[in-house]
Amino acid sequence: MADTTPNGPQGAGAVQFMMTNKLDTAMWLSRLFTVYCSALFVLPLLGLHEAASFYQRALLANALTSALRLHQRLPHFQLSRAFLAQALLEDSCHYLLYSLIFVNSYPVTMSIFPVLLFSLLHAATYTKKVLDARGSNSLPLLRSVLDKLSANQQNILKFIACNEIFLMPATVFMLFSGQGSLLQPFIYYRFLTLRYSSRRNPYCRTLFNELRIVVEHIIMKPACPLFVRRLCLQSIAFISRLAPTVP
């Protein structure tokens, strides 16, 4: 009896915290489900046919999470242009659109990584809050894993941004290979411009600039053929014209 009494208040504290923050708890559960489905798609332990269904479930769960988060950020829905403009500034709206773009498309492993990693990062943050409510010294091994995940957050966000960027040519390739729709590259381009302009997550914009600097450094070397240099410079100029203006 003496061993079990301390666990009661700890567990009650965690449950009370989750009940007090019901919307955050609902998003936490949907993110954990997204991570679960994404993992079973990336690692098809139950077979390739089941993996495709887990791909769709992961995107649907992410759409639910994004919708809940958007409601949390903008609780008072209005059918107006001003509300839509405000919604398009939110990262949750971006990934609601992202989920809808890919949910009925041919399964692409690259497209599931942003969903998986964002869900993992946000779920880890809330899990730490639940553990804190349970007790400052509860489950030290899990806390250690969560701390390591947080320590690598910047690298993970850069990897997500890299996926977001290279999915643009991937959607074009899918179109010409017969695995994508005609509208998908255009809608995804709109998503990418929203990510480029994101106020809360500048990693997509930063990575674009870093890639441009790296390419320019390589093509300016004397060993680079002239036609390759011209092609790259024209491509950089074209992409720069497509980039939205960021205030």
Curated annotation (Swiss-Prot):
Prostate cancer and several cancer cell lines (at protein level). Widely expressed. Expressed at higher levels in endocrine-resistant breast cancer cells as compared to endocrine-sensitive breast cancer cells. Expressed at higher levels in early recurrence breast cancer tissues as compared to non-recurrent breast tumors. The keyword Electron transport does not apply. Residues 2-31, 122-155 are lumenal. The keyword Manganese does not apply. It is found in: Endoplasmic reticulum membrane; Melanosome; Nucleus envelope. Its main location: endoplasmic reticulum. Keywords: Acetylation, Endoplasmic reticulum, Immunity, Innate immunity, Membrane, Nucleus, Transmembrane, Transmembrane helix. One of its GO terms (cellular component) is nuclear envelope. It is a multi-pass membrane protein. The modification N-acetylalanine is found at A2. Disulfide bonds: none annotated. Induction: By endoplasmic reticulum (ER) stress. Residues 53-100, 177-247 are cytoplasmic. The chain crosses the membrane at residues 32-52, 101-121, 156-176. One of its GO terms (biological process) is regulation of endoplasmic reticulum tubular network organization. Acts as a regulator of the tubular endoplasmic reticulum (ER) network by modulating intracellular calcium homeostasis. Mechanistically, stimulates PKD2 calcium-dependent activity. Suppresses the RTN3/4-induced formation of the ER tubules. Positively regulates PERK-mediated and IRE1-mediated unfolded protein response signaling. Plays an essential role in VEGF-mediated release of Ca(2+) from ER stores during angiogenesis. Also plays a role in the modulation of innate immune signaling through the cGAS-STING pathway by interacting with RNF26. Belongs to the PER33/POM33 family. Interacts with EIF2AK3. Interacts with ARL6IP1, isoform RTN1-A of RTN1, isoform RTN2-B of RTN2, isoform 3 of RTN3 and isoform 3 of RTN4. Interacts with RNF5. Interacts with RNF26. Interacts with PKD2. This is Transmembrane protein 33. It comes from Homo sapiens. The lineage of its organism: Eukaryota, Metazoa, Chordata, Craniata, Vertebrata. The gene is TMEM33.
